[in-house]
Amino acid sequence: MILEIPKNAETILHILEKAGYEAYVVGGCVRDSILGRSPDDWDITTSAKPEQVKALFHRTVDTGLQHGTVTVLMEKEGYEVTTYRVDGEYEDGRHPKEVTFTASLEEDLKRRDFTINAMAYNPSSGLVDLFGGLEDIERKIIRCVGNPLERFTEDALRIMRAVRFSAQLGFTIEEETRKALKVLAPNLKHVSAERIQVELVKLLMSPHPDYLRVAYEAGITAEFLPEFDACMTTSQNTPHHCYTVGEHILHSLCHVRTDKVLRITMLLHDIGKPVVRKTDENGRDHFKMHGIAGEKMAAQILRRLKFDNDTIRKVTRLVKWHDDRPDGTTKAVRRAVNRIGEDLFPYYLEVQQADMLAQSDYRRTEKQERLDKVKEAYETIINEHQCVALKTLAVTGKDLIEAGYKPGREIGETLNRLLEVVLADPQKNQKEILLGLLDEK
């Protein structure tokens, strides 16, 4: 098997070999090359010690000397070069207490997480595949190297990585590896919220975001997203739905494009339903105000998982208003844009579409027609530059002060009253007309 390696990476391999050391590209770059994907990074493993690597190259950065890693700079790119190593005892379910350098490539590959990530390649000696990684790629399987209980005990983040790789590649998790996931899922408590967030986002942004189901079945989501587990066991006895809340969420994830805000919104859009669910005397379920409840819960979840404030703001607002259903008139849609926000309204339309497609077929045509009218009205509002917020109102606070108003709450209240007039009739968004309305309390 011949893999195409970037010229700079091949140069590093050649320099190391010429100096008498072994050197290979290793891990994810080998996996992705075999899969026909374009690797993000090209990592190199070598028998040379860090100080020996530094002696061979003019430009290096000490990125992880304690783990044997030196970054070699070639032109404008950096390549991590790491000495063959054996990890010592893991003291926190995440990091080895110490690492020991070794002269054996096999020992280095043996410590890696999954067989598909434990392959090395060198143009002269070809593919080194000691654990069946190539066969597992061909069979589309995620399998731990060696004993899965040991691999997941060493580093609990591998529990998330197993599901994430499965979702990114569309692979199945091998049976023994899957069993180990279930046993050791509680070890995720040793992993920081930031690291769990990174893996969750990668899973959600994958071609198979619904593989979150695998994480649920293995008891993984119970450790960091128990609110989702509650959704998986909450039925929806209503003609509008044909799935549990959780299954509806999983289906909806597949109906939005690969966008971080959209995918997280779909994950959390109905998170409030288990809390507000009421069943009437006919056995029909109702979920009134689930958007409001969901907004609060989504904020708690996103803060817990250490998401940035901008993502929290966008997602919680979309969760709050995701079930808002204006009719297709431009007047109703102007008010909806004002409520939801100009920046988020296009997202809201995509959320509504995905939500509908993950429901039952009940009144589907009618629902689609209403949504299409909303989209048309929104296009009209945008094309005609109609005012939907204070920032485009023809009158400003300064105008009101010049008209005799005192700075303070009254100005804000007056501007909002004038905005209401304009939302009802955009033709009135003219300075003279609005100033003429000031005496009409």
Question: Positions of the model-derived regions?
Answer:
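Catalytic cores of the polymerase beta-like nucleotidyltransferase superfamily
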Residues: 1-441
